[in-house]
From Swiss-Prot:
Keywords carried by this UniProt record: Acyltransferase, Lipid A biosynthesis, Lipid biosynthesis, Lipid metabolism, Repeat, Transferase
Pathway listed: Bacterial outer membrane biogenesis; LPS lipid A biosynthesis
EC number(s) per entry: 2.3.1.191
Complex formation: Homotrimer.
Known function: Catalyzes the N-acylation of UDP-3-O-acylglucosamine using 3-hydroxyacyl-ACP as the acyl donor. Is involved in the biosynthesis of lipid A, a phosphorylated glycolipid that anchors the lipopolysaccharide to the outer membrane of the cell.
Active site per the UniProt annotation: H244
Stated name of the protein: UDP-3-O-acylglucosamine N-acyltransferase
Assigned GO CC terms: membrane
Any one GO biological process: lipid A biosynthetic process
Source species, domain of life: Bacteria
Record Gene3D superfamilies: Hexapeptide repeat proteins (2.160.10.10), MurE/MurF, N-terminal domain (3.40.1390.10)
Catalytic activity, as annotated: a UDP-3-O-[(3R)-3-hydroxyacyl]-alpha-D-glucosamine + a (3R)-hydroxyacyl-[ACP] = a UDP-2-N,3-O-bis[(3R)-3-hydroxyacyl]-alpha-D-glucosamine + holo-[ACP] + H(+)
Similarity comment text for this entry: Belongs to the transferase hexapeptide repeat family. LpxD subfamily.
């Protein structure tokens, strides 16, 4: 494993404040780990005030902290930063550098002569690349990837094993896809006539922006007539489905096992929790948040946090809904009490 010095951290984090760290200049730090598991050669981090006591007891030699926890840990060797989690991510990358391409190409590939492969791009075993496709510079195409005709993949892409890019799919720079995801398969379009389901040709494309990351086993379908589009900076968890004609804005996050039905439009910075179902032709405005397990059948009217099943309720509305649901179990008891009161005051109870 890579080991790093204090001086490397100081170079990486020029805006950070290093406190009580002078005695650590000769230490070879061997990793970054949790407060409870850290040893004398480790770095750890304090995500919030909740973990201050754990931090005080930790054996880590150096802690990444925020300004709000720095005073409570002033006797420790600390790095004071504005964003603890972001800094932690940068430090982890020091210990675990990303795999870099070297331009190696397996002999067991099938690449059409008309395809263009950029410089310093790795191509693994059993990769196929179709006619007139363009692969950018500094990409890593892992084993078993299937790339159709006229596909474009931008510079710096990382394509996991057995991913499939159907004809005419376009993805931007620094695209990441983990294994077994598919892009540009036919949308689910059929018309029932003459006693059977007749397929509607799906002739649109999938067009994906820059800096998008897609987990394993995701499916993004081509549009029927227009393109399915994914904006810049989007991050999809495993097993996310995007149906035909969807328009996804920039920096959208979708957690695992969630699906967008056809022609859904998501604004920028939308967050969709896990196991959500978004019905067709809905629109979510910029910044909308859908809580995990929700199912939407109507478009939310404003930017808010929505939660529920076929309800489209804001979070405060859902809290009231939950209270009412709990009260239903007492309904028969309350009805009996009302009947008894009516008898006492001489009101005849009428059956409806």
């Amino acid at each position: 494993m890579t080991q790093i010095k204090l001086s490397t951290l100081q170079t990486l984090l020029p805006d950070a404040t290093f406190q009580n760290s002078e005695t650590l200049k000769d230490i070879n730090f061997s990793g970054l780990t949790s407060l409870t598991l850290a040893g004398p050669s480790d770095i750890s981090f304090v995500a919030s005030k909740t973990f201050v006591n754990e931090a005080k007891a930790s054996k880590a030699s150096l802690l990444v902290v925020s300004q709000e926890t720095a005073e409570a840990l002033s006797d420790k060797a600390i790095i004071i930063v504005s964003k603890v989690e972001l800094t932690t991510a940068k430090i982890i990358r020091l210990f675990f550098p990303e795999k870099q391409p070297s331009g190696k190409r397996s002999a067991q590939v099938a690449i059409d002569p008309s395809a263009k492969i950029g410089s310093n791009t790795d191509i693994g075993h059993f990769v196929t690349i179709g006619k007139d496709s363009i692969i950018g510079n500094d990409c890593i195409i892992e084993d078993g990837v299937k790339i159709g005709d006229r596909v474009q993949i931008g510079d710096g892409a990382r394509i996991g094993k057995n991913c499939v890019f159907f004809d005419d799919t376009i993805v931007g720079k620094r695209f990441i896809a983990f294994g077994n995801s598919t892009f540009g398969g036919d949308g689910f379009g059929f018309v029932y006539a003459e006693g059977k389901h007749n397929k509607i040709p799906q002739v649109g494309r999938v067009v994906i922006g820059d800096d998008v990351e897609v987990g394993s086993n995701c499916t993004i379908d081509r549009g029927a007539l227009t393109d399915t589009t994914i904006g810049n900076g989007c991050k999809f968890d495993n097993m996310v489905h995007v149906a035909h004609n969807c328009k996804v804005g920039d920096h959208v996050i979708i957690a695992g096992q969630s699906g967008l039905a056809g022609s859904v439009t998501l604004g920028n910075n939308v967050i969709i929790g896990g196991a959500c179902a978004i019905s067709d032709h809905l629109t979510l405005v910029d910044g909308t948040i859908i809580a995990g397990g929700s199912s939407l059948r109507t478009s939310p009217k404003t930017k808010d946090v929505y939660v529920g099943w076929d309800l489209g309720l804001t979070f405060p509305e859902f809290q009231k809904y939950r209270v009412n649901i709990k009260n239903i179990v007492n309904l028969n008891k309350w009805l009996k009490r009302i009947e008894n009161i009516e008898k006492k005051v001489g009101i005849e109870t009428k059956e409806s």
